[in-house]
């Protein structure tokens, strides 16, 4: 089954690569229109997925990721339209020039070909990834989690209907709707057809892909994100940033999971933090210093060492008091996932040092980690947030779904 999907996807990719920007945008507009027109069928499938997931004991954080509403689906359709407004990188001449030999050389941006994406309970990923791949002239094979298989199947049917209406092969966007996990292992070995693989899920999925895939893999999305409250931080705006980074949408990978507090500000800062977190319903997981300093009003539990490596994806926040900037940077290097980390400070020397020494995909000064997002960065919807350094890093927009080719123009030109 998968080999036939691969053959069809590869054939579709050749046709997509030849489309003009206008032709690709017309497809995306049609997809957005169909998502709204077929909203009832997608939401009906999603209700079944959510009910099944709840019966299976899925956490509230995961249920939030899984659930669609009319407003969320409308926002997804609007995101597709936003992709239409983005500049098409395909065909862009990156650089080039005339060589001494007389050969005119250019480096031109081209589609990757076929992209494979493995993801868990995030139905919006289906549309986000499909729209970005189509905009860049790539075919895509999707493998969502079993929790979303009804939603994904309904969504892909809508996308394929739009493709067909525009005279394009339905195989440009395909989904593996069989929940059999052995198919993941088979997909990882489809290097004959898939040019790049992107896993979006937990550490176990990423480890499996790194170890078993014969396809180039871009991993990311695991966000043990930190905020360091420096000794010179302005407490009121710092609390506002922390509330946003923790509570706006706790189930996302750019949510802060560990707060590092400079010891020189801890006595003044921790009580204010506790009050604010109590109002926000956040449970604090405090180290020994925090446990001794606080006795309410926020719910407070002792921090377990293994929780420093946790991606809670819930209203839980580790709080650790550190001696100085060195301690904060060392902690992030040991426990961070190179996703998003921030410093809250009034000392621009410390800010510069933090930015230079924290090796994460996104580093912030006096701002929330929640900004690590394709839409917020002006990239449109994102296919993933890469925490590695090759071939993309941070939110992966359109350019991350392209490669380049060298093209030489001669006039009977030969090498001397």
Swiss-Prot record:
One of its GO terms (molecular function) is NADP binding. It is found in: Cytoplasm. One of its GO terms (biological process) is L-proline biosynthetic process. This is Gamma-glutamyl phosphate reductase. HAMAP family: ProA. Keywords: Amino-acid biosynthesis, Cytoplasm, NADP, Oxidoreductase, Proline biosynthesis. Belongs to the gamma-glutamyl phosphate reductase family. It catalyses: L-glutamate 5-semialdehyde + phosphate + NADP(+) = L-glutamyl 5-phosphate + NADPH + H(+). Pathway: Amino-acid biosynthesis; L-proline biosynthesis; L-glutamate 5-semialdehyde from L-glutamate: step 2/2. It comes from Salmonella paratyphi C (strain RKS4594). The keyword Amino-acid biosynthesis applies. Catalyzes the NADPH-dependent reduction of L-glutamate 5-phosphate into L-glutamate 5-semialdehyde and phosphate. The product spontaneously undergoes cyclization to form 1-pyrroline-5-carboxylate. InterPro entries: Ald_DH/histidinol_DH (IPR016161), Ald_DH_C (IPR016163), Ald_DH_N (IPR016162), Aldehyde_DH_dom (IPR015590), G-glutamylP_reductase_CS (IPR020593), Glu-5-SA_DH (IPR012134), GPR_dom (IPR000965). Pfam families: Aldedh. PANTHER family: DELTA-1-PYRROLINE-5-CARBOXYLATE SYNTHASE, GLUTAMATE SEMIALDEHYDE DEHYDROGENASE. The lineage of its organism: Bacteria, Pseudomonadati, Pseudomonadota, Gammaproteobacteria, Enterobacterales. The keyword Cytoplasm applies. Its EC number is 1.2.1.41.
């Amino acid at each position: 089954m998968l080999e036939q999907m691969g053959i069809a996807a590869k054939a579709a990719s050749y046709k997509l690569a030849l489309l003009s920007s206008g032709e690709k945008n017309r497809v995306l507009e049609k997809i957005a229109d169909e998502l709204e027109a077929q909203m009832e069928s997608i939401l009906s499938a999603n209700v079944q997925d959510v009910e099944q997931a709840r019966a299976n004991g899925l956490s509230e954080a995961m249920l939030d990721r899984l659930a669609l509403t009319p407003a969320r689906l409308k926002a997804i359709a609007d995101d597709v339209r936003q992709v239409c407004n983005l500049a098409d990188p395909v065909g862009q001449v990156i650089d080039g020039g005339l060589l001494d030999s007389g050969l005119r050389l250019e480096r031109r941006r081209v589609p990757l070909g076929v992209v494979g994406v493995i993801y868990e309970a995030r139905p919006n990923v289906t549309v986000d990834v499909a729209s970005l791949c189509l905009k860049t002239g790539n075919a895509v094979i999707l493998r969502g989690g079993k929790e979303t298989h009804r939603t994904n199947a309904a969504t892909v049917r809508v996308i394929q209907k739009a493709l067909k209406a525009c005279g394009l092969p339905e195989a440009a966007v395909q989904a593996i709707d069989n929940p059999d996990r052995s198919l993941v292992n088979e997909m990882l070995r489809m290097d004959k057809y898939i040019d790049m693989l992107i896993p979006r899920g937990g550490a176990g999925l990423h480890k499996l892909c790194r170890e078993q895939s014969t396809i180039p893999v871009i991993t990311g999305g695991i966000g043990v994100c930190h905020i360091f409250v420096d000794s010179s931080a302005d407490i009121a705006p710092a609390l506002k940033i922390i509330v946003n980074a923790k509570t706006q949408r706790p189930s996302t990978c750019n949510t802060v999971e560990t707060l590092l507090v400079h010891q020189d500000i801890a006595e003044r800062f921790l009580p204010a933090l506790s009050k604010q977190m109590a109002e926000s319903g956040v449970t604090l997981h405090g180290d020994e210093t925090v446990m001794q300093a606080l006795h309410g009003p926020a719910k407070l539990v002792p921090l377990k060492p293994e929780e420093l490596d946790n991606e809670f994806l819930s209203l839980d926040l580790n709080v650790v008091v550190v001696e100085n900037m060195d301690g904060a940077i060392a902690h992030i290097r040991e426990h961070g996932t190179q996703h998003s980390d921030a410093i809250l400070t009034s000392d621009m020397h410390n800010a510069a040092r933090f930015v230079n020494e924290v090796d994460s995909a996104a580093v912030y000064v006096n701002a929330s980690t929640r900004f690590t997002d394709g839409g917020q960065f002006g990239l449109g919807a994102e296919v993933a947030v890469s925490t590695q350094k090759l071939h993309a890093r941070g939110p992966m927009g359109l350019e991350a779904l392209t490669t380049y080719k060298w093209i030489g123009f001669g006039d009977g030109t030969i090498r001397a």
